[in-house]
Amino acid sequence: MKKIIILTLALTNTVLFAKENASLERPEKGQGESGMAQRVMANCSAPKASKELWLNNVRTIVYSGGDMWWDLNGNNQAYYYIPAVQNRNTGVSSSFAGSAWIGGLDAGGQLKVAAMTYRQNGIDFWPGPLDTINTSADPAVCAKYDQIYQVSRSEVDNFVASNGKDITPNILNWPGNGDVSKNQGRRLAPFVDINNDYFYDPATGDYPAYDVENKAEKDVLGFCKTKLFGDQTLFWVFNDNGGIHTETQGVPIGLEVRAQAFAFKTNDEINNMTFYSYEVFNRSSFQLNSTYFTLWTDADLGYFLDDYVGCDVKRGLGYIYNADPFDETAQGTNGYQDYPPALGCDFFKGPLADFGDGVNNDQDSLTDEPGETIQMSRFTYYNNNYGAFPPQTTNPSIAIHYYNYMTGFWKDSSPFTSGGNAYGG
């Protein structure tokens, strides 16, 4: 059995795992892009860019629309290989797809949601920053930012050590600034501003904002001041206002998201991990209430019909593991064979909690302490549209379905219950 997992932060956070079955309604080759392109009626073109994150024992891929871990432009197969392999045909993947979901209510109670899954029905995200004045997306800007920028810690170290002489194309082309003539944010990708002129210029010594001096400085709330992470980093910008929300059928929020995917090369367990950071800006003129940030995960641990999912509440960790000691190769999918691993999905740091809300958001012994962050608040799953499952527990198709899954309810707004399949118990 295969389920879709949802981890949620109640900004708030959620982890959502989707559980699929054999046929799972995955997109056929080419279906996702063509079916979606016919439905997008707004200005920006669908996101197309992708880039591999492949530094340590993980080989995976991310897309400029915020979705990741699957081969959208190839054979629509899983693309999160552990261990990393040169020949993907011989590799075993532990996840099929993933994306960030965000939803909430405006002051009038109108639901606004942005999400991505398999692009079968459409998309809710487009590349590029938004106009900070009127929240609009410019098709030319979307096209310009339909790319993923890559940089490594080693090349920045070398740049600084050589006093700016050893400059690489990655450093030179780093998108440090938005276009203020188009009302974009002055700062875009994080960089160290040597002369404090707010303008990214490697010729004056500016560089992508790794902690080159290894100071590990923290701000007044105890958070790391460093803005760029990893030994290798991918950076991209996307928004939810570049067109009609054909994935969720929802109302756009006006979000600009600056994302990082990064990895470390180590000799311990971190060598089997990848990390993701999202800086979310609400560019609209309204406040979003009852807001949830969700990591949607279609986790396939090798062969996808013998997996279970679970949640460690204290750690805020969603996980997937094999149902038996042997993960077979079947239905064109490579399994892990003997001693299959488990895969975890964790929120290391959520958003800052509202001060004085009286809630122990980080589940420690203190309430409303300075710098308190929100940890995972929901863990849910749903079944793909295949098999004898109650229809209320299957794929979401409209905005309220997505929001219900993010907030711990089924599509019909009934709560998850204890025991069985968690529906109607």
Walk through the language-model features, giving the residues of each.
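Bacterial Sec-dependent N-terminal signal peptides
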Residues: 1-24
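A long-range scaffold signal marking pre-active-site subdomains of enzyme folds
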Residues: 19-425
